[in-house]
Design a protein with these regions (language model features):
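Bacterial N-terminal signal peptides that target proteins for export
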Residues: 4-29
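Bacterial N-terminal signal peptides
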Residues: 28-39
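Residue-level hotspots at or immediately adjacent to binding/recognition sites across diverse folds
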Residues: 39-355
Length: 355
């Protein structure tokens, strides 16, 4: 009897010990998972910027805004977009009013505007180019060849009576006489592009319509140079850093930075600034050589002060009900983020503690 009782007690003791050990094991696993989650989240959810330098402005239109530019005084500015939208500001972009031009019954999508002093150029689709020499008080229509390869996508004011215009298939033209005559700079087009960027040195980069490849063009080259994308992810957008290197955004919010500016085919390792927002990164702009801002869908706005090594998030604008699909700095103290449904963000340096 004692032997049986001893055996029962021993079995119960073992079961209790196993239960305690199992409970301790589960607790240990739980604590480990909590620690892992906390560590992981530090790389998923970014720290907030110390201040919000962006003022939200409601525009008197729900048209899609494509571009922004200012005349020489920095007070007289213009926004252009779909539905023949032309908005004018005379107070450095704080308020905007519609400007109606007599362009007939055709509805245009204005795609690009740029100024050199008070001389400005505006292009759009279907083929249209407007020119001003008085800051936009008056605009004249510059006739374009009906056989123009593609439709105007990008225009850059390059000096007195001078401009460069690029079409949506990569044809590039220049004028030195106010638009009366145009000279082609490339012998062949690159194909339909989803976006195109030009830096101050006159270099271009364009992403193919499906994001399968990108092309570059340098002044003096007879044709665009095609480049395969770095990996399997399709390209979303590309542009230039302050140093003339390339940056790219791929689908899924992946970013890379170019490491040389000769062949434009060497890249840093891919990064995802914030996994939680990685699905919607759309554009990049540099305020300084080291400070860059990245815009995205659903009010996502990220910022780095060290060239993309570390990142912060401007959470003050994440509830703005729009996609931030373009960002543009016109100087260190002037910047704009173009949204949808009539939303515009204006950079106010006075509101910023960022260096």
């Amino acid at each position: 009897m004692q032997t049986v009782l001893t055996s029962l007690l021993r079995s119960e003791f073992l079961r209790s010990g196993l239960a305690l050990a199992k409970g301790a094991w589960k607790k240990g696993i739980t604590l480990a998972l909590v620690a892992l989650l906390a560590t992981s989240c530090s790389g998923v959810f970014l720290a907030e910027t110390e201040s919000n330098p962006w003022e939200v402005i409601a525009l008197p239109t729900e048209a899609a805004i494509s571009d922004v530019a200012f005349a020489s005084d920095g007070e007289h500015g213009w926004l252009v977009g779909s539905r023949t939208t032309l908005l004018e500001s005379t107070d450095a972009g704080k308020t905007w009013d519609p400007r109606i031009l007599e362009l007939g019954e055709q509805n245009y999508t204005f795609t690009s505007i740029d100024f050199s002093g008070d001389e400005g150029w505006l292009v759009g689709q279907p083929n249209i180019m407007l020119h001003t020499t008085d800051g936009g008080t008056s605009w004249s229509n510059i006739p374009l060849d009906p056989q123009l390869p593609g439709q105007p996508l990008l225009v850059t004011a390059t000096g007195k009576n001078s401009a460069e215009m690029a079409t949506d298939i990569g044809a590039i033209y220049t004028t030195k006489d106010g638009g009366q005559k145009w000279k082609g700079l490339v012998q062949s087009a690159v194909g339909v592009v989803r976006n195109m960027s030009r830096n101050e040195e006159g270099r271009y980069v364009a992403v193919s319509s499906r994001g399968n490849f990108y092309s570059t063009w340098l002044p003096g080259q007879e044709a665009w140079q095609p480049h395969n994308r770095e990996n399997s992810k399709r390209l979303q957008n590309m542009g230039f850093t302050k140093e003339g290197l390339l940056w790219l955004i791929a689908r899924g919010g992946q970013m890379q930075f170019g490491t040389e500016q000769t062949e434009y085919e060497e890249w840093s390792e891919p990064i995802n600034p914030e996994f939680a927002a990685s699905w919607g990164l759309l554009d990049v702009a540099y305020r300084t050589p080291e400070e860059l801002w990245v815009t995205g869908g659903s009010g996502n706005l990220l910022m780095s002060t060290d060239g993309g090594e570390t990142w912060m998030k401007d959470k003050a604008v994440e509830d703005v009900p729009t996609n931030f699909y373009r960002i543009k700095f016109l100087g260190q103290d002037r910047g704009y983020i173009l949204g949808q449904r009539g939303y515009l963000l204006r950079y106010e340096e006075a509101h910023s503690n960022l260096v």
